Amino acid sequence: AKDGYLVNKSTGCKYECFWLGKNEFCDKECKAKNQGGSYGYCYSFACWCEGLPESTSTYPLPNKSCGRK
C-alpha cells in the first residue's frame, strides 16, 4: 500500500478541500471503489489518502500537470 494525494485523472489536479484534518469528502473519495484507500483527510488544502493500492494514481501524474495544457 502507499499514501498520496488523490488526483483527478482528467485534469491532473489534486482534490481540493478546505476543512483541514478530518474531512468527510476526502475520506469518502479515498475509500471509493476506484481509489481503494483506507483513510482520507485534508492536508494542505488537498485530499491526502492512506492505504492506497499501488495501482491507484496519485499526484502528480507523469503526463499531466494541473492547470497546464
Curated annotation (Swiss-Prot):
Superkingdom in the source lineage: Eukaryota
Propiece span(s): 67-69
GO biological process, one term: defense response
One Pfam family in the UniProt entry: Toxin_3
Signal peptide extent: 1
Any one GO molecular-function label of the UniProt entry: toxin activity
Modified residues annotated as Cysteine amide in this record: C66
Annotated localization: Secreted
InterPro entries tied to this protein: LCN-type_CS_alpha_beta_dom, Scorpion_toxin-like, Scorpion_toxin-like_sf, Scorpion_toxinL, Scorpion_toxinL/defensin
Record note on domains: Has the structural arrangement of an alpha-helix connected to antiparallel beta-sheets by disulfide bonds (CS-alpha/beta).
Family indicated by similarity: Belongs to the long (4 C-C) scorpion toxin superfamily. Sodium channel inhibitor family. Beta subfamily.
Protein name, entry field: Neurotoxin Cex3
